[in-house]
Regions:
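C-terminal helical/coil "lid" or tail adjacent to the Rossmann-like core of SAM-dependent
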Residues: 197-227
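A short beta-strand submotif of the Rossmann-like class I SAM-dependent methyltransferase core
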Residues: 91-97, 123
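A short glycine-rich, Lys/Arg-flanked "PGG" loop and its adjoining helix->strand segment in the class I
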Residues: 105-120
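Short alpha-helix
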Residues: 169-194
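Core SAM-dependent methyltransferase catalytic element
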Residues: 188, 233-249
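A short acidic, Gly/Pro-enriched loop at the edge of an enzyme's catalytic core
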Residues: 80-92
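Conserved class I S-adenosyl-L-methionine
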Residues: 121-158
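Conserved N-terminal segment of class I S-adenosyl-L-methionine
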Residues: 1-80
Length: 249
């Protein structure tokens, strides 16, 4: 009970910071818009790790879940064991959730099971580039290693904190470095979109820290500048990726 309460308090603190920072909310709004562009318009969407519930502003028919209780979510569930029927959702979305998973292979199997044929999963996750690797290693508590077997099944760790423990290098290893292995393990799934995101706007918001170095009024304009620069600088310093996976019809 104490562990569950601690995790709930951590999530509440994170959500409270988010709700106070308009600049950060504007960045996340742009993330949800990017995911929405690549999702199916029909059927229901499931969000894994919904936290503040702000996805409802972009997705109207959406069911929100998180690993600990939140007043903003519809249910509590473990992403490794999703409590839904087969082929139940047309879309699955998540932001900064995948790299916290202890066994991402199990999650992808579950996601494939509950997606309809033609269903899509859109994830926004950390991306390891020459510059971002420095930032993640020195300014984040999580590991940042891509020299791993991302498909390895790990024994359950009761001491693991699902909100804080993770590996920022996991998504890069899983979807980029081991892309061919991914498609062999999941022949029913196909990566249909990979896009580099985020250069400087998100760091200037301070993320979930209690400071912000930019006025919220500038965020949308600077995001446009960032989108212009990404084709030039993305391979060198992009901080995030958008990966869209489709279940074959």
């Amino acid at each position: 009970m104490q562990k569950t309460t601690t995790h709930k308090n951590e999530l509440d603190t994170k959500v409270n910071v988010f709700l106070k920072k308009t600049a950060l909310q504007n960045v996340y709004e742009s993330f949800y818009e990017k995911m929405y562009e690549h999702c199916n318009e029909f059927g229901e969407t499931l969000e894994i790790g919904s936290a503040s519930g702000k996805s409802r502003n972009s997705f109207k028919n959406i069911f929100l879940s998180d690993v600990v209780f939140s007043h903003h979510s519809d249910t509590v569930c473990d992403a490794h064991f999703l409590p839904f029927k087969n082929k139940n959702f047309s879309n699955i979305i998540a932001i900064d959730t995948f790299h916290h998973l202890q066994n991402p292979l199990m999650f992808v199997k579950e996601a494939s099971r509950i997606l309809t044929n033609g269903g899509r999963m859109a994830l926004i996750e950390p991306l390891v580039t020459p510059i971002s690797q420095i930032i993640y290693k020195f300014f984040h508590d999580e590991d940042c290693s891509t020299n791993i077997n991302p498909f390895q099944i790990n024994a359950p760790d009761q001491k693991r904190n699902p909100l804080k423990d993770g590996n920022n290098g996991l998504p890069t290893a899983f979807f980029l470095k081991k892309k061919d292995s991914f498609h062999k393990k999941f022949p029913e799934l196909k990566i249909v979109k990979f896009q580099r995101l985020s250069l400087f706007v998100y760091p200037l918001t301070g993320g979930y820290r209690n400071w912000c170095l930019m006025p919220s009024l500038l965020v949308k304009s600077l995001l446009k500048v960032e989108n212009f620069l990404l084709p030039l600088l993305g391979r060198l310093m992009a901080l995030r990726m958008l990966v869209v996976i489709e279940k074959r019809k």
